[in-house]
Amino acid sequence: MRYHFRMSSIIVPAILVSSKKELEQQLLKARNVGTDVQIDLVDGHLVSPASWPFTESPTDLDIEKILEAVPAGMTFEIDLMVERPLEVLDAWIQAGATRVLLHLGGLDQIGTLISEIKKRYGYDKEFIPELLSLGIAINVETSLDLVEPFIQDISFVQFMGIRRIGAQGQPFAPEVLPKIAHFKSKHPEIPIQVDGGVTLESAPGLLEAGVSRLIIGSALWKSRDFELTYVLFQEMTREHGMFAS
């Protein structure tokens, strides 16, 4: 029986692996708690070190291996920390990706890139637009002014909670909190997620700042009990911020 993920989780495990086997193992753990996942794709050029599948083939992606690794019918989010996003996007959409993240500040001509993605997967193609959500990731040092030209083109934003992207287990950068608050006050309609440095200690403040999705890496994967830690994060969403009951 194939498991179908819902794209509505608040607590989202971030998967950053160097092998196909690791990816399959972490997807299985995430599936057991019924959650969405974010798969981090790092080409080793825009950001390093490289993640799978770039660790096996830096240039040519093996679509069949990607399809083998991801359960049929599963949908997920991809964080594209790569120099040439369009060259890898098709393979991962075939595998089930429905949310796509581009990194503002790391890519030149991001406006042209967004236009091309909309053209390829928009209303003029045999693809349902509502199934593909496009977001922009904002580094700690990136000015929010750089986001403004693309507000009408994106479905959500992701604030990076760490200073060095592409590596899990780094300390949370507290200076991101006022940036989140400022963006939330200016664009209350745009969902915000945070990736990097999300722990049981930093999560309450992020939720209270208006964050609607927490992308969590080492705090889940390096915990003694993945499922219990996931539940603890879930309980926090009911105690803090917009999800408090």
Regions found by a protein language model. Give the residues of each.
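Hydrophobic faces of well-ordered beta-strands that scaffold small-molecule active sites
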Residues: 9-15, 37-39, 74-80, 100-102, ...
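Catalytic cores of alpha/beta
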Residues: 23-29, 84-94, 141-153, 198-214
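Conserved, mostly hydrophobic/aromatic
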Residues: 30, 39-40, 92, 157, ...
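Glycine/Thr-rich beta-alpha phosphate-binding loop at enzyme active sites
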Residues: 44-57, 140, 146-181, 185-187, ...
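Glycine/small-residue-rich loop that forms an oxyanion/phosphate-binding "nest" at active or ligand-binding sites
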Residues: 50-113
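Alpha-helix-loop-beta-strand connector modules within alpha/beta enzyme cores
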Residues: 53-78, 116-140, 175-193, 233-245
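Hydrophobic, well-structured mid-protein blocks that either form specific transmembrane helices
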Residues: 87-145
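Glycine-rich phosphate-binding active-site loops on the catalytic face of alpha/beta enzymes
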Residues: 100-109, 158-169, 209-230
